[in-house]
Swiss-Prot record:
GO terms for MF: proton-transporting ATP synthase activity, rotational mechanism; proton-transporting ATPase activity, rotational mechanism
The species this protein was found in: Corynebacterium glutamicum (strain R)
Gene: atpF
Keyword entries, A-Z: ATP synthesis, Cell membrane, CF(0), Hydrogen ion transport, Ion transport, Membrane, Transmembrane, Transmembrane helix, Transport
Pfam families: ATP-synt_B
The name this protein goes by in its record: ATP synthase subunit b
Amino acid sequence: MANSIYNLAHADALPLESGNSILFPPLYDIVWSLIPFLIILIVFWKLVLPKFQEVLTEREDRIKGGIQRAEAAQAEAKAALEKYNAQLAEARTEAAEIREQARERGKQIEAELKDKANEESNRIIESGSKQLLAQREQVVNELRREMGQNSINLAEHLLGDQLSDNVKRSGTIDRFLADLDTVAPNGK
């Protein structure tokens, strides 16, 4: 280093005073540096850049494809959701209709059962009325027979006469019962 300083001190010109600049290299250095740079640039331009462009294009296509697939899946999911909502609304409507039909059918069954119960009640009442009328007729006939017999016995006892004649006996009984029939409706 001391030698360099000595050389600089004995030189005719200082380093900045000569035409060569420290910041700007000489022309031959620029030319010889430019040639390898151009060779490297051409190699990159012809070999590396197309491969790089191909990789970028492929990646861009994959990304676009992924986005398109995602959009398609999203559209499909949205369509499925709309379909599901439509089916759900349809099922709710159908359930409401079924409930309404069940209510109507229940009311109809209730009305039918009431009608059947009324018919059965009327039939039982009518049957009871018929039985009551039949029993009444039977009781009236038995009472007529007994009253007829009792009236004959009473008449024989009162008259002291025996009513042996069937025609006389039946005429007397019929008159007595006719008198009772005319008295009974008025006495009710």
